[in-house]
Design a protein with these regions (language model features):
Chain C
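The feature captures the beta-strand-to-loop junction immediately N-terminal to the Walker
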Residues: 34-36
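Catalytic Walker B motif of ABC-type/P-loop ATPase nucleotide-binding domains
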Residues: 143-147
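Conserved ABC ATPase "signature" region
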Residues: 85, 89, 96-114
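ABC transporter nucleotide-binding domain
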Residues: 159-175, 179-237
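Conserved structural motif at the start of ABC-family nucleotide-binding domains
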Residues: 3-5, 18
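Helix-to-loop junction immediately C-terminal to a conserved catalytic motif
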Residues: 49
Length: 342, 277, 268
């Protein structure tokens, strides 16, 4: 047994990659997630509308960070802003007592607001929770969860697609056939795309039925978002596949891309609560934007126009992944040509 | 025009020179064999000729064009692992290749493969899958056929049959580049390129390679001490049916140490040893 | 007392890897198993050392066997010395005798100068020699080597065979498998395997003598029992009838194995 232990020790010490993972990874992960994990709400972007727009803001608790004060805007305008996610709280002033509109799809902000208002009630101020009146956790979690599951499974499955070809030697054959690198990329994604699309529908349907998640908006923006999101998730998988030497490595990398998405995409810990140094990682993750789109459509009934930004970003991410993967393929399938070009 | 022209081709992986200043050509209808042990650089060379690996220096041209720009349809390749999809059937594999190259799928009956058409490649014996890979590589009538150790692990009958097929393909005008580590297969090639440690140590047909090289045959009954002495002097000692043969030392030197010996023409294997020393 | 297999059959599900195969390996002698990939050489080796169960027949195996698998058996990220020390430790060999034995083996194989080199940095020939040394280190009575010479250059092959002969000279029984028919003459006995079945067995001379019919050489093929050999064709005549335009030649082992394979094919 001693001989065995000694041998293993020697092998591990020589395996620099695994050693780096064992020592460096836990430290990095702790730092990143430590700064990310926070339910504390520091600011709630707020809008004040109606005739009281000028003097109401100073009366509001500090937590309500007034970004817009528009005397000419109406309650309908305020609801629009909330639906589009521009602000998460609106104070509607008018003839009667002011009404506070809360965005129920931002659970922690809504709860923080309710707490503050209950603790130090402003006389005559009433509040209404829009979009998730019960402040139900599942309603807020399920859309994001669905996305997480899809990204996890989708990336994992496609991450092995190219590696398998390399291991069986068929990648070389593809390289000597008249295929263009983008043919190979799209061909590899296509079947998974179809299956995963059906998957998303199933997962979201079950989610809405079992967990009482509403579907308040039109399905179109959701579909657009889901398709763009899928393209990115599967594309990342293929990209991982093209840089992995074997299936074990591919799975490792796929898992490593899944972990940050749980913690940093805003599905559990709100992005606004994260330290800025860590928050930017969240802005690079496709799940962050799918979460915004899914919650926006399902809970807030947001339309295409409201969700233009996250949708555009998803499409942009897709384009970046596509370019990276195709470039990577080109250097693998036609290295001699790449050389000649330089 | 030479179909395949390799000039001063080199490939370095860090400190290791996998291929070192290699030059050779393959003409239309010619069978050229890359001969050498594992690690001599045969597979690396082939991958550079196919454009799968970029050389560190030197160049490879196919039909006068740099390999990166060659129309893939001019190439046919059977790698060591055969390059077939194990979960797909023979028919599906061949159809995929045919479609990729834009030709009609081959006639399975004519190739003697109809009984295996709907069997998965992963379930068939090596001999059959080798033939399938061979068909897949030439169904688009390539100008160049590159075969990486097609006879590795094949018994004598299988090897003979494979070489028959290779000769038939060459007769249609295809240039064939084959690699092997069986010395006796040098006879099957029009020309051989002997490789050792990435370098070309000889080229030509079998008689040209052997030409003039002599070995000293020594009858059995020589002590180990004497053999060690021969080795110290720089000779290589090989076993033969009836004694020892010494490569690399002249008769006079050998006789002095051992007391006897006759000069005989070298075998191909002995020539290889002498040239790669 | 010879080691080996007696009419052993090994099945994996529906496939029969070995069918009624017998082989004897005498102490102090080298038995050679020749066959193509998939013929059953590796299964035979693994069965003989006890890594595979059998579905019929008997195995005669000593307590101490040494085995070198097809993949050389060397650990790539350990040095030559560490590889040998590991084997010594695994077998619980006493330190001093083990160290002496390791030194002797390093000298005999010529690996002394490479003792601190990592397994993956060794040339093919050196790696194979190390693998054999590791199999022999524990002083087994039966040594089984699976394709130690495949893919090696002629000089390394010769050095490996010298090492094997030396080890046989120490009284060990050795079984070596190979795909090169010309290596069969290095052994005391040969077994030709094809598809799990024995095509021929005995000493090389016996096997060649036992070939049925006669062998001819011609510039052209003649019927289904012809095959290319270099620039000419070999033609087998099962009934020893002369073939027009061909000259009779004496067969070597490769010819005999080919004939046996042809005959087996005809029977199927």
């Amino acid at each position: 047994m001693l001989a065995m232990t000694l041998k293993e020790f020697r092998q591990v010490v020589r395996d620099h990659r695994t050693l780096a993972m064992l020592i460096v990874m836990p430290v990095v992960l702790l730092l990143v997630f430590g700064y990310a994990a926070s339910f504390d709400v520091d600011v709630i972007p707020t809008a004040v509308v109606g005739p009281g727009a000028t003097n109401v803001p100073e009366q509001l608790p500090e937590l309500f960070d007034v970004e817009t004060a528009d005397a000419d805007a109406t309650r309908a305008n305020a609801e629009e802003m909330l639906r589009a996610g521009e602000v998460n709280l609106a104070v509607v002033t008018g003839d009667g007592p002011p009404v506070v509109l809360l965005d129920g799809s931002e659970l922690f902000m809504a709860r923080a607001a309710v707490q503050i208002l209950a603790a130090a009630p402003i006389p005559g101020l009433d509040y209404v929770v829009l979009f998730n009146p019960e402040l139900d956790t599942s309603a807020v979690l399920v859309p994001g969860l669905a996305g997480l599951i899809i990204v996890f499974v989708g990336t994992l499955v496609t991450s092995m697609s190219v590696v398998r070809e390399r291991e069986t030697g068929t990648l070389e054959q593809l390289a000597v056939m008249p295929f263009r690198p983008r043919d190979v990329f799209m061909g590899k994604i296509a079947p998974y795309f179809l299956i995963a699309s059906i998957d998303i529908v199933i997962v979201l349907t079950i989610g809405t039925l079992l967990f009482d998640v509403p579907l308040n908006g039109s399905v179109l923006p959701l579909i657009v978002g889901a398709l763009a999101f899928l393209f990115v998730a599967l594309g990342v998988g293929v990209l991982i596949s093209s840089v992995s030497e074997n299936q074990a490595q591919a799975i490792q990398l796929a898992l490593m891309t899944a972990l940050p998405q749980i913690m940093l995409s805003g599905i559990i810990f709100p992005l606004s609560s994260m330290a800025p140094a860590v928050r930017w990682i969240g802005y690079l993750l496709p799940l962050t934007y799918f979460n915004q789109v899914a919650k926006g459509v399902m809970l807030r009934g947001a339309g295409l126009g409201d969700l233009l930004m996250p949708l555009a970003l998803l499409v942009a991410l897709g384009a970046v992944i596509f370019t990276l993967a195709v470039t990577r393929f080109r250097s693998q399938l036609r290295p001699a040509r790449v050389r000649a070009a330089t | 025009m030479r179909v395949v022209a390799v000039t001063a081709l080199s490939k370095r992986f860090g400190e290791v020179r996998a291929v070192d200043d290699l030059t050779f050509e393959v003409g239309q209808g010619e069978i050229v064999g890359l001969l050498g042990a594992n690690g001599a650089g045969k597979t690396t060379t082939m991958r550079m000729v196919l454009g799968l690996l970029a050389p560190t220096s030197g160049r490879a041209l196919i039909e006068g064009e740099p390999v990166g720009r060659v129309d893939r349809r001019r190439l046919g390749y059977v790698p060591q692992g055969l390059g077939l999809y194990r979960e797909l059937t023979v028919a599906e594999n061949l159809r995929f290749s045919a479609e990729a190259f834009g030709t009609a799928p081959p006639d399975l009956a004519a190739e003697g493969l109809s009984e295996y058409a709907n069997r998965k490649v992963g379930e068939l014996p090596r001999g059959v899958t080798r033939r399938v890979a061979f068909v897949a590589a030439r169904l688009h009538d390539p100008g160049v056929l590159i075969l990486d150790e097609p006879t590795s692990g094949v018994g004598p009958l299988g090897r003979a049959r494979l070489w028959e097929s290779i000769h038939l393909v060459a007769e249609t005008g295809t240039a064939v580049l084959v690699s092997t580590h069986h010395m006796e297969e040098a006879e099957e090639c029009d020309r051989v390129v002997l490789m050792a440690q990435g370098r070309r140590v000889a080229t030509g047909n079998v008689s040209e390679v052997i030409s003039g090289l002599r070995t000293v045959a020594v009858v059995a009954g020589v002590t180990t001490a004497r053999l060690d002495e021969i080795r110290r002097l720089g000779g290589t000692v090989l076993l033969s049916n009836d004694g020892w043969r010494v490569v690399g030392l002249p008769l006079s030197v050998v006789s002095e140490v051992v007391g006897s010996g006759t000069e005989v023409p070298a075998t191909f294997e002995e020539a290889f040893v002498a040239l790669s020393a | 007392m010879s080691w080996g297999l007696s009419r052993v059959t090994v099945r994996f599900g529906d496939a029969t890897a070995l069918a009624g195969v017998s082989i004897d390996v005498e102490p102090g002698e080298v038995a050679i198993v020749v066959g193509a990939d998939g013929a059953g050489k590796t299964t035979l080796c693994r069965t003989l050392v006890g890594l595979e169960g059998i579905d019929g027949g008997e195995i005669r195996r000593p307590d101490r066997t040494g085995f070198q698998p097809e993949t050389s058996g060397v650990w790539n990220d350990l040095t030559v010395m560490e590889n040998l020390e590991f084997v010594a430790g695994a077998y619980g060999l006493a330190t001093d005798p083990a160290r002496r034995r390791i030194e002797t083996l390093l000298e005999v194989t010529g690996l002394g100068g490479a003792r601190d080199r990592l397994g993956r940095q060794l040339s093919g020939g050196m790696r194979q020699k190390l693998g054999v040394a590791m199999a022999v280190l524990s002083d087994p009575e039966l040594l089984v080597l699976d394709e130690p010479t495949t893919g090696l250059d002629p000089v390394s092959r010769l050095e490996l065979w010298s090492f094997i002969s030396l080890t046989a000279g120490e009284g060990k029984a050795i079984l070596v498998t190979t795909t090169y028919t010309d290596e069969a003459r290095r052994g005391n006995s040969v077994l030709a395997l094809d598809g799990g079945r024995s095509l021929a067995s005995g000493s090389v001379a016996e096997v060649i003598d036992a070939m049925p019919g006669a062998l001819f050489e011609s510039a052209r093929s003649h019927g289904p029992s012809s095959w290319r050999r270099g620039r000419t064709w070999r033609i087998w005549s099962p009934e020893a009838e002369p073939v027009p335009g061909a000259t009779e030649v004496s067969p070597d082992l490769a010819d005999v194995v080919t004939v046996a394979a042809l005959a087996a094919e005809a029977r199927r």
